A protein has these predicted regions:
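Predominantly flavin-linked oxidoreductase catalytic cores and closely associated redox partners
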Residues: 109-297
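Internal hydrophobic alpha-helix adjacent to the cofactor/substrate pocket in enzyme cavities
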Residues: 355-376
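A glycine-rich dinucleotide-binding beta-alpha-beta segment and adjacent secondary-structure elements
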Residues: 283-349, 356-358, 376-393, 401-403, ...
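Beta1/beta-strand and adjacent pyrophosphate-binding region of the FAD-binding site
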Residues: 2-14
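C-terminal auxiliary extensions adjacent to catalytic cores
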Residues: 88, 401-453
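N-terminal FAD cofactor-binding segment of flavoenzymes
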Residues: 20-82, 380-391
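Residues at the starts of beta-strands that form the adenosine-phosphate
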Residues: 5, 28, 154
Length: 453
């Protein structure tokens, strides 16, 4: 057992989970949380694991992607989910919590652990061994240190996320595959096309613009206000600049002849492949601040997307995150130091559960490394493993944060048409595989019910 003290930078969900996993595996840990010495615009307390936005961890149903990820985390002994259960309030199938009770439960467990100490104050350099889990509001000084280490373009400070649609929910009798002017990096792309294209008539385009302009926009928090860059304006902001703006921007039809009519459409919405398997496609240029209900209503009015299944919704907000596929190892360590792990939203995951999950695996893997072993990643048939695969294999040129969704998972060996049954089969396979993986690598669950000394 290594006697090296581990530094956790950031006492949020991911940092707290990582600290617990390491301490339960016999490592001495110091959690550094900069609050209250350095305040943020989002936090209201000094507590570790403060929930600054919603008070829900989303669904617990394993036929839901978020519920499946929770089930996998429970198998591994998640502190965060233990605390959420302790603080649970009525919320139907959602794991809703009392924020104060939740944060208190996490902090009290960490404070009571004989191997964990908590220090308040800002960390401005990158320690080793460590887990960097500073979240979307990473301090300027540490962000500068990360950029110096990873490269000037490796760290983003705002995300502009376009919705992602499930391939099998797209109407391929309406949508056609093509690249603009027949261009492509490979012969297959030039022959078949790299994009899915939704052609619009003038009437359809005008109706779409009306719906887009009438959509209800998320106002956000003061800390969440993102400066709009000309290269990634919200789609509704572009529409507000003039009714033809989108038609001469991301919806320009030139070079995309509709094979059914032999003519260019009045406007074309393009979808670009998001994953290697081709099951997830994002709406190109459709970063948006529309509320979720209006995103679904407005974007389903696009020809070919009437039954679109949204695997990820669009957003624009303050979010410090690393271009993980370009900058980190598959285990989310620095490439020049395998004892510095990143976890939480800074890796490019979205959501409370996803952030906590990466903290859990970072803690497990740093423990393995300190004991002379290698990091291990669950198979991509599990939600945790599939998230890590996305962070490893996503296109670095178009990398955007991702939440848990079934489109990330390996396809089932035998197709399933019924959506509910398909998700149940995904879940059954994932839970069996996480158990096998856990057994293969002798990963005992770090159960929060008892402190290990």
């Amino acid at each position: 057992m290594s006697d090296t003290r581990v530094t956790i930078v950031g006492g949020g969900l991911a940092g707290s989970e990582a600290a617990w996993q390491l301490a339960e595996r016999g490592h001495d840990v110091t959690v550094h949380e900069m609050r209250p010495v350095v305040k943020t615009a989002a936090h209201h307390t000094e507590s570790l694991a403060e929930l600054v936005c919603s008070n829900t961890f989303k669904s617990t149903d394993t036929s839901n992607a978020h519920g499946l990820l929770k089930a996998e985390m429970r198998a591994l002994g998640s502190l965060i989910l233990w605390a959420a259960d302790e603080a649970r309030v009525p919320g139907g199938a959602a794991l809703a919590v009392d924020r104060i009770v939740f944060a208190s439960a996490v902090q009290s467990r960490l404070e009571a652990h004989p191997r964990i100490s908590i220090e308040r104050g800002e960390i401005t350099t990158i320690p080793s061994p460590s887990v960097i889990a500073t979240g979307p509001l990473t301090s300027d000084a540490l962000a500068t240190a990360l950029r110096a280490r990873l490269g000037v373009d490796a760290l983003s400070f705002y995300d502009a996320i376009a919705p992602v649609i499930a391939y099998d929910s797209i109407d391929h009798d309406v949508v056609f595959k093509a690249s603009r002017y027949g261009k492509g990096e490979t012969e297959a792309e030039r022959e078949e096309g790299a994009y899915l294209n939704c052609p619009m008539s003038r009437e359809q385009y005008e109706s779409f613009i009306d719906a887009l302009l009438a959509g209800d926009k998320y106002q956000g928090h003061a800390f969440d206000e993102a400066p709009y860059f000309e290269g990634c304006l919200p789609v509704e902001e572009m529409a507000a600049r003039g009714r033809e703006t989108l038609r001469f921007g991301p919806l320009k039809p030139v070079g995309l002849r509709d094979p059914r009519t032999g003519r260019d459409a009045y406007a074309v919405v393009q979808l670009r492949q998001e994953d290697r398997a081709g099951r997830m496609w994002n709406l190109v240029g459709f970063q948006t601040r529309l509320r979720i209900g209006d995103q679904e209503r407005v974007f389903r009015s696009i020809p070919g997307l009437a039954n679109a299944e949204f695997l990820r919704h669009g957003s624009i907000h303050r979010n410090s995150y690393v271009n993980s596929p370009a900058s980190l190892t598959p285990a989310l360590t620095l490439r020049d130091d395998g004892q510095v792990f990143l976890a939480g939203q800074i890796t490019g995951v979205e959501g409370y559960t996803e952030s906590s999950a990466t903290g859990l695996l970072a803690g497990i893997n740093l423990s393995r490394v300190l004991n002379g072993g290698e990091p291990v990643i669950p198979p991509a048939t599990t939600m945790l493993g599939a998230l890590y695969r996305y962070l490893r294999e996503a296109d670095p040129a178009h990398f955007q944060p991702m939440n848990a969704n079934f489109g990330l998972l390996d396809e089932l060996p035998k197709p399933e048409r019924d959506k509910r049954r398909k998700r149940e089969r995904f879940a059954a396979r994932a839970l069996a595989d996480i158990e096998s993986w856990q057994r293969e690598h002798s990963l005992d669950a770090a159960l929060p019910g008892a402190v290990t000394t």
